[in-house]
């Protein structure tokens, strides 16, 4: 079955280690191959069985089925490409859009050099790096949410409308409701 190692309590080295709370590897049953040689296959086969079982019992589609004869009105990338897509969509010059996309990793690489932090200082007290990270996260979320909206609402996220648009909407509703 397995190899079991019995401790020799007359061994002075083992007694000294046991007095310090060490020496646990001198006795007991080793994990390899006794335990792990049957735990690994059980876990792997169990994971495969659960995956196949869920796929058979609940076959849910991922997204809409593809229709090669109908092109969608607006083609959107996957959600994790939304900020990049929004940059390319809003910048009029495509070369400038590509340069802006390249400046994001270049700017991220320069953030650690903005502050002088010695090795004994708390790394969590870095106000410039923290501010740049928070602003970068907010801008990425703003660009990502804006990419899912139509182009005319993408920069304001549909939260703000100009007074002219609001007045025209009011006039249109007044016109149609006056005939009801």
Curated annotation (Swiss-Prot):
PROSITE patterns associated with the record: CYTB_CTER
Gene3D superfamilies: plastocyanin oxidoreductase, Single helix bin
Top-level lineage group: Eukaryota
Topological relation to the membrane, as annotated: Multi-pass membrane protein
Annotated Gene Ontology cellular component terms: chloroplast thylakoid membrane
UniProt GO MF annotations: electron transporter, transferring electrons within cytochrome b6/f complex of photosystem II activity; electron transporter, transferring electrons within the cyclic electron transport pathway of photosynthesis activity; oxidoreductase activity
Localization in the cell: Plastid, Chloroplast thylakoid membrane
Keyword set, alphabetical order: Chloroplast, Electron transport, Membrane, Photosynthesis, Plastid, Thylakoid, Transmembrane, Transmembrane helix, Transport
Transmembrane segments: 36-56, 95-115, 131-151
UniProt cross-references to Pfam families, sorted A to Z: Cytochrom_B_C (PF00032)
BP GO annotations: photosynthetic electron transport chain
Oligomeric and partner information: The 4 large subunits of the cytochrome b6-f complex are cytochrome b6, subunit IV (17 kDa polypeptide, petD), cytochrome f and the Rieske protein, while the 4 small subunits are petG, petL, petM and petN. The complex functions as a dimer.
Similarity annotation: Belongs to the cytochrome b family. PetD subfamily.
Function recorded in the entry: Component of the cytochrome b6-f complex, which mediates electron transfer between photosystem II (PSII) and photosystem I (PSI), cyclic electron flow around PSI, and state transitions.
Protein known as: Cytochrome b6-f complex subunit 4
Gene name for this UniProt entry: petD
């Amino acid at each position: 079955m397995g190899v079991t190692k019995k401790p020799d309590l007359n061994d002075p080295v083992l007694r000294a280690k046991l007095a310090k709370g060490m020496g646990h590897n001198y006795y007991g049953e080793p994990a390899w191959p006794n335990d792990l040689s049957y735990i690994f296959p059980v876990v792997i086969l169990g994971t495969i069985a659960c995956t196949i079982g869920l796929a058979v019992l609940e076959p849910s589609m991922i997204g809409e089925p593809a229709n090669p004869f109908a092109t969608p009105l607006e083609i959107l990338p996957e959600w994790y490409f939304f900020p990049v897509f929004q940059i390319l969509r809003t910048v009029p010059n495509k070369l400038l859009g590509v340069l802006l996309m390249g400046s994001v990793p270049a700017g991220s690489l320069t953030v650690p050099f903005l502050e002088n932090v010695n090795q004994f200082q708390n790394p969590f007290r870095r106000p410039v790096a923290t501010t740049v990270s928070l602003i970068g996260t907010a801008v990425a979320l703003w660009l990502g949410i804006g990419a899912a909206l139509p182009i005319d609402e993408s920069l304001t996220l549909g939260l703000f409308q100009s007074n002219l648009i609001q007045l025209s909407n009011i006039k249109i509703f007044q016109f149609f409701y006056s005939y009801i």
